[in-house]
Amino acid sequence: MSERKFFGTDGIRGKVGSGQMTPELALKLGWAAGRVLSRSGTNKVIIGKDTRISGYMFESALEAGLSAAGLNVMLMGPMPTPAVAYLTRTFRAEAGVVISASHNPYYDNGIKFFSNDGSKLDDNLELEIEAELEKPLECVESHLLGKVSRIEDARGRYIEYCKGNFPADQTLTGLKIVVDCAHGATYHIAPAVFRELGAEVIAIGDKPNGVNINDKVGATSMAKICETVLTEGADLGIALDGDGDRIMMVNSRGEVIDGDQILYILACDAKARGVLRGGVVGTLMSNLGLDLALQALDIPFARSKVGDRYVMELLKELDWRIGGENSGHILNLDHGTTGDGIVAGILVLAAMRRQNATLEQLTAPMEMLPQVLVNVRFEGEHDPLSSDKVKAAQALVESQLGARGRVLLRKSGTEPLIRVMVEGDDHNTVLAHANLIADAVKSAS
């Protein structure tokens, strides 16, 4: 496959006004995508965005570019990423476009595409779009220009879709839930979903102003929701990230429930109902505790590379349905085509209701093992991981950890770093093992 110049593993992303994230590129990208997408299909594209102040600028630029290529554009306004995927399918659009940098600060933004079935755009189509970007922009004739309209009921459509994933014979009456929207795209969606299902909802991170997205709130900053759950005496908390495709939870004791624990709950519930197909896909960073807990239930477990794109690829390869990352990207292909924080939360709540159990009770059988990550910077072209000294240190640690431990060494994809991750039963022992390997990496670099 050819090397991609613009698209990364999750679209195009960067600091606004520099590099690739400029209005000029967005205009040209809209036109290039329109040229490729107009070759077949309905000539209709949906655009959604999160709450960053730069979203308006990029929305206008993309809209102009797509229109110049002859495509009709339907604007959703601020809506979660999974909502764009869902409405792309239901409107039979040729593609969906999301303007978001997910969990990044407000000064970053990004653009990613969904295909007509709500999945991430095929690599070959991204390469075709990149090829068009190299050409001069040529507007279609005036009578062929695309029109622009707004989906007035996008919010209501998506709220009903989310609620449809909860059992019709159950409610959330009697539950007090703190919902943290990260001042992001779910601010007008998530609280309404859980309230309409009957819960008492305390919303935080629900007042976006364009520059406060993910600022000390949301799934990547859990201190505030943990504190709020305790002070409000809530049963649990649900924290979403800026574009709503990631979830972390909090139990009534104020303890964080991460993506690995959520996967365990969903797998156990699916197995109990006889609907679990195959096993569960995690990543190289998934806690060993998840692997061991699933083994105890005879549920297969497989690891992909880090990134929800790779989780999806392995799910499709194995024909399994449930997978995700410890960071909170949760995929359940029986309930959608992409990670959806709100729907994942609903599925956990459904499991709680079906089993008449608390979040603490559902996660109790899974023991999270201590995990230590040490980053070691290196210079030059030499690969420290090929060093005999590093290999010997890794082998020594692995032999001492045995079946209840794990070592992972990998290069960072963005920085000159070797990431040393060690898991085991005792935190101090794990820390010592991680430092032993890190010292070997340092001496080899």
From Swiss-Prot:
What is this protein for, i.e. what is its function? Catalyzes the conversion of glucosamine-6-phosphate to glucosamine-1-phosphate.
Q: What is this protein called?
A: Phosphoglucosamine mutase 1
Q: Which UniProt keywords apply?
A: Isomerase, Magnesium, Metal-binding, Phosphoprotein
Report the source organism.
Shewanella sp. (strain MR-4)
Mention any one GO cellular component term assigned to this protein in its UniProt record.
cytosol
Q: Per the UniProt record, which EC number(s) apply here?
A: 5.4.2.10
Swiss-Prot/TrEMBL catalytic activity: alpha-D-glucosamine 1-phosphate = D-glucosamine 6-phosphate
PANTHER family from the entry?
PHOSPHOGLUCOMUTASE (ALPHA-D-GLUCOSE-1,6-BISPHOSPHATE-DEPENDENT) (PTHR42946:SF1), PHOSPHOHEXOSE MUTASE (PTHR42946)
User: What molecular functions are annotated in GO for this chain?
Assistant: magnesium ion binding; phosphoglucosamine mutase activity; phosphomannomutase activity
As to how many cofactors bind and how, the note says: Binds 1 Mg(2+) ion per subunit.
Residues modified to Phosphoserine:
102
Against Gene3D superfamilies, the record matches this protein to: Alpha-D-Glucose-1,6-Bisphosphate, subunit A, domain 3, Alpha-D-phosphohexomutase, C-terminal domain
Q: Per its Swiss-Prot or TrEMBL entry, what cofactor is needed?
A: Mg(2+)
Gene Ontology annotations of biological process type: carbohydrate metabolic process; peptidoglycan biosynthetic process; UDP-N-acetylglucosamine biosynthetic process
Q: Provide the record's note on post-translational modification.
A: Activated by phosphorylation.
Give the annotated active site. Answer: 102
The answer to whether UniProt assigns keyword Glycosyltransferase to this entry is no
Per UniProt, Mg(2+) binds at: 102, 241, 243, 245
Matches recorded under NCBIfam families: glmM, PRK10887.1
Give the protein family.
Belongs to the phosphohexose mutase family.
Q: Which SUPFAM superfamilies match?
A: Phosphoglucomutase, C-terminal domain, Phosphoglucomutase, first 3 domains
> One Pfam family name from the record?
PGM_PMM_III
Q: Which CDD domains match?
A: GlmM (cd05802)
- Keyword Translocase belongs to the record: no
